[in-house]
Amino acid sequence: MIRIDGSYGEGGGQILRTAIALSALLGVPVEVFNIRAKRANPGLQPQHLTGVNAAALLTDAELEGAAKGSTRLVFKPKTIKCGGFQIDIGTAGSISLVIQTLTPIALFAPCPVRLSITGGTDVAWAPPIDYMRFVFAPVVGRFGGRVKIEVLRRGHYPKGGGRVEVEVAPVDVLKPVDAVDFGKVLKIRGISHAVNLPAHVAERQARAAAEALAKEGYAADISTEVRNDGLGPGSGVVLWAESDVGNVVGGDALGERGKPAEAVGREAAEKLLTALKSGASVDSHMADMAVVYMALAEGVSRITTPELTLHLQTNMYIVERFLPVKFRVEKLGQRHLIEVNGVGRRR
């Protein structure tokens, strides 16, 4: 059994998500202790438990300590199952973080995995669902993984109620990705959404984002999505840039009470511009998710990221605990190069 100190590095839910995903897909039991020990509300919270229980559902895992507030969890997986699964987070807990946990497992299932997930689509401290659709899924696609994400209804804090359907096709082996330079920007697109709010909120967010990008010489095609089917109000913007060599980077921002729509649009644009100006092949959020796929792929993968975040360093550490790999990190001007010789995991 692999033992992981949950207070290492970033010391949050990321350690748990990565450890559980790798435990499940490799069939190796794991014990995570000191879970979120340094946080104001230590231990497992409902959104963490959802990911753990969902991974257990996919692998018939035995669990110890899977309770709210628990600082120790033992996860003993069996075989990966496939087919359809219903997952209800029960709060506005992030659907995206559940997708992040389950995708690597589902890629190595014996047949396609279909997930119907209820919870929060656009919530703080997690990637928005449109980021998962238009940045995460294409990047996983470069490794040879097919992930299809469909949003049936959006859900915001505090009520949630969002509904998302995900389909993951199995792979025999993941391909390595060699992406050092972002390349030339082909197009920038985006979605500005508003739920149970006036249409002008989505329009103002989109306009402000487009103006901020235009000042830097970039034209953007940002669509607006106005819906009135949510359990509560909410808004946000996700932008993404695609390059001539197949790279995708993103930037996003969430609306909140008292925050002008224009500020939301500008914030998303600034995040995207940070990634573009660095010339990195992935943005800093995608980098910490990508290292799992790099380590599982067959052969040498290389990516560059605008910054070496604590999340990224923590994830590399966890991956190295589960797999016989060693990440190499090198500073390249404004970027950091991450390189690893993957194990070529097969189903």
UniProtKB/Swiss-Prot annotation:
It is found in: Cytoplasm. It comes from the Archaea. The keyword 4Fe-4S does not apply. The active site is at 311 (tele-amp-histidine intermediate). InterPro entries: RNA3'-term_phos_cycl_insert, RNA3'_phos_cyclase_dom, RNA3'_phos_cyclase_dom_sf, RNA3'_term_phos_cyc, RNA3'_term_phos_cyc_type_1, RNA3'_term_phos_cycl-like_CS, RNA3'P_cycl/enolpyr_Trfase_a/b, RPTC_insert. Keywords: ATP-binding, Cytoplasm, Ligase, Nucleotide-binding. One of its GO terms (cellular component) is cytoplasm. Pfam families: RTC, RTC_insert. One of its GO terms (biological process) is RNA processing. The keyword ATP-binding applies. It is an enzyme of class 6 (ligase). One of its GO terms (molecular function) is RNA-3'-phosphate cyclase activity. Catalyzes the conversion of 3'-phosphate to a 2',3'-cyclic phosphodiester at the end of RNA. The mechanism of action of the enzyme occurs in 3 steps: (A) adenylation of the enzyme by ATP; (B) transfer of adenylate to an RNA-N3'P to produce RNA-N3'PP5'A; (C) and attack of the adjacent 2'-hydroxyl on the 3'-phosphorus in the diester linkage to produce the cyclic end product. The biological role of this enzyme is unknown but it is likely to function in some aspects of cellular RNA processing. This is RNA 3'-terminal phosphate cyclase. It comes from Pyrobaculum calidifontis (strain DSM 21063 / JCM 11548 / VA1). The lineage of its organism: Archaea, Thermoproteota, Thermoprotei, Thermoproteales, Thermoproteaceae.
